[in-house]
């Protein structure tokens, strides 16, 4: 009986690994990602952060890449995306900016932005 359980566990793990890899590849080519450009020294960013965190709680499946423009690598990526102000939220698919939202916007505006993207 133990051998059967071990075999099922091994097959189950392999199946999960294969499905996870297949699902990740499919998701990464079709899904958008959210990129949040900010700076801790930006007053607007500090005001906006609680609003962003509140709205993101409604979208637990959404992962957000955070770019702090005080870090050189993050600044380069933010500039590549076209950031002109902080805070800015980009929707990026396959490296291409699909949409962006700039500034310390109201919670209703941010929620509407996320609803359009989901």
UniProtKB/Swiss-Prot annotation:
The keyword DNA damage does not apply. Residues 1-27 form the signal peptide. Pfam families: Thioredoxin. It is found in: Secreted. Keywords: Disulfide bond, Oxidoreductase, Redox-active center, Secreted, Signal. InterPro entries: Thioredoxin-like_sf (IPR036249), Thioredoxin_domain (IPR013766). One of its GO terms (cellular component) is extracellular region. Gene3D superfamilies: Glutaredoxin. Disulfide bonds join 42-45. Residues 28-114 form the Thioredoxin domain. Stimulates the oxidation and reduction of disulfide bonds in vitro. Belongs to the thioredoxin family. This is Disulfide bond formation protein. It comes from Brevibacillus choshinensis. The lineage of its organism: Bacteria, Bacillati, Bacillota, Bacilli, Bacillales.
């Amino acid at each position: 009986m133990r051998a059967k359980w071990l075999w099922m566990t091994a097959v189950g793990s392999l199946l999960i690994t294969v499905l996870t890899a297949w699902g990740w590849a499919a998701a990464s080519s079709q899904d958008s990602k959210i990129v949040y450009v900010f700076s801790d020294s930006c007053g607007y960013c500090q005001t906006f952060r609680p609003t962003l965190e509140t709205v993101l709680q409604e979208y637990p499946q959404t992962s957000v890449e955070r770019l702090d423009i005080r870090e050189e690598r993050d600044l380069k990526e933010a500039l590549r995306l076209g950031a002109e102000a902080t805070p800015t939220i980009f929707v990026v698919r396959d490296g291409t900016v699909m949409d962006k939202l700039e500034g310390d916007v109201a919670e209703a505006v941010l929620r509407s932005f996320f609803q359009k993207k989901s």
